[in-house]
Curated annotation (Swiss-Prot):
Catalysed reaction equations from the record: K(+)(in) + H(+)(in) = K(+)(out) + H(+)(out)
One of the record's GO molecular function terms: symporter activity
Pfam families membership: K_trans, K_trans_C
GO cellular component: plasma membrane
Residues spanning the signal sequence: none
Keywords tagged on the record: Cell inner membrane, Cell membrane, Ion transport, Membrane, Potassium, Potassium transport, Symport, Transmembrane, Transmembrane helix, Transport
Superkingdom per UniProt: Bacteria
Protein name: Probable potassium transport system protein Kup
Entry's localization field: Cell inner membrane
Spans traversing the lipid bilayer: 23-43, 57-77, 111-131, 148-168, 179-199, 217-237, 258-278, 287-307, 348-368, 377-397, 409-429, 431-451
Native source organism of the sequence: Bordetella pertussis (strain Tohama I / ATCC BAA-589 / NCTC 13251)
InterPro entries in the cross-refs: K+_transporter, K_trans_C, K_trans_N, Kup
Keyword Transmembrane listed: yes
Amino acid sequence: MTHTAAGAPRDAKTAIHAPSSRMALMLGALGVVYGDIGTSPLYTLRACLNTIDDLQPAHVLGVLSILFWLLMIVVSLKYVTLVLRADNRGEGGTLALLELAVRGREGRARWLLIVLGIFGAALFYGDSMITPAISVLSALEGISIVSHTLEPWVVPVALVVLVALFAIQSHGTGAVGKLFGPIMALWFATLAVLGGYQIWLTPEVLAALNPVWALRFIAEFPVMSFLLLGAVVLALTGAEALYADMGHFGRPAIRRAWFAMVLPALTLCYFGQGALLLRDPAAIRNPFFLMAPEWGLAALVGLATVATVVASQAVISGAFSVTRQAVQLGFWPRMQILHTSAVEKGQIYLPQVNALLLCAVLVLVLLFRNSENLAAAYGFAVTGTMLTTSVLAFAVLPRDSTGGKRVLWMVLLGALLVIDILLFGANIFKIHEGGWLPLLVGVVVFTLMMTWRRGRRLLADMQARDRQPLREFMTQLEAFPPARVQGTAIFMTMNAGNVPPALLHNLKHNKVLHDHVLFLSIRVADVPYVSEDERFEMHKISASSWQASINYGFKEDPDVPDALRQVAEAYPEIDLEPMRTSFYLSRQTVVAARRPAMARWRRALFAFMARNSTRSTRFFKIPPNRVVEMGMQVEL
């Protein structure tokens, strides 16, 4: 007998974020989605042109043209127009796209996509470390334009701002978050006004809108053009957030915000800086802040600092979200996940991730000291993630197309993939300048994620090899039962349909069986949310035992007591009164096998991660005073 929980399907995305109007959604997208790419003008053009010794108008116009057309091709075409189509039930991001890419695939192709997707997600952590450091530093560097005597204060003030930013994470950003949209709207308006005024003074800069300037620059300086791509890509930082945050605001709001406000403001700002450099090449020391009048510099530094805090908040929240997805999909050990809002379910806080990010960001600020030094490190993380997205999109978007439409998809995505390869290749040459940092972070996180996934898979395979069919076992056990005790025993199991080790240990040591036995398995679907009518499935195993499977999406937090309340309503014959219910869990200790399935260092790493993962009781919200843990050793 199978049962599915009753209830109307729930639109999870609407439940999480349902603003009352299109304008509210667009304003929210400005504050969350576009903070990173919106603060790129602080450092991008300076990083592009600072290495050219004798800056000429042709250099300025050529680089501006390349920058503008990359914005149009990579952001407007690739992300806003195409990649946003690859949604996993309304959700985006590397791991959501990975789940779509591997769906229905087996063998080597599936394994390669998983490896690529995990490495792309791992590189995102490098981005999450660099973005707060480079953004806040670049904003505060404006105080050296206000007064040279203030320059030594840039790093100390940046450290204070960053510590404060990470300190407030545990309290949530609900109240302050309502200001993010208006703050970024003011920021983009400021970019447009500053840039527009400079263009009005030097309208010749608009010639760079013609792609001929980009092609001419590439033809005349091919090597320089390729290497400059490593800096021009800084204008694209944050493009990945458009896709990752699709679940919060929806495709239409993100597209409207980009074309109506963000793209025009960025274009005006970059071309405004170019206009200033055409008149005064010496302004390359900080073209963004030198666009402003002296009387407005202090206010601009303050606004820029607040805008970079908003941008940093977006990537910190993104790191929390990616980690939760990785935990739910089995790529990361269980971690403590706290909700900071009773209304917004998407507002979460992971203490361990927050602490590690803070330490990493502070080290980066002290190590690199200024935004220019961090620029090389930034580009590698960004282009690596973008390349991953392109490959996964190549595996997803043409899938349901046939004939000429499929060929068109392949050609278009192939061309975009070539551009991403060029951008990534240009940043490989910057590994020695700082690109080693996100590469190192990516390799470390990738190794951790693959080790955890491999270890869990080996444990599951080991249990499957030693499996005993649950239905037959319970039928035989009830035919010759041990002593029965009152109440209900709930056995958590990884493999539904097989006898859980905790039951065998309980029978061996305690020699009793409860009046009611419920075998409970938690399943995470390859979709972000599961509707309430699909929350659980029930099968009757024997006269006094049942098998329950509770289903969650990869963006949901398991809540076993809440799910059991639904089971109790549907199955009143099972005694699930909390005070008469005991949970039996297995606690495994990894030891070396005679023929190890993992290298010694990987086995030690997996065992360390397992010991330090959040306990099952806390992760599944099970009352600890109702839990019996059965310790056992497993060989790897």
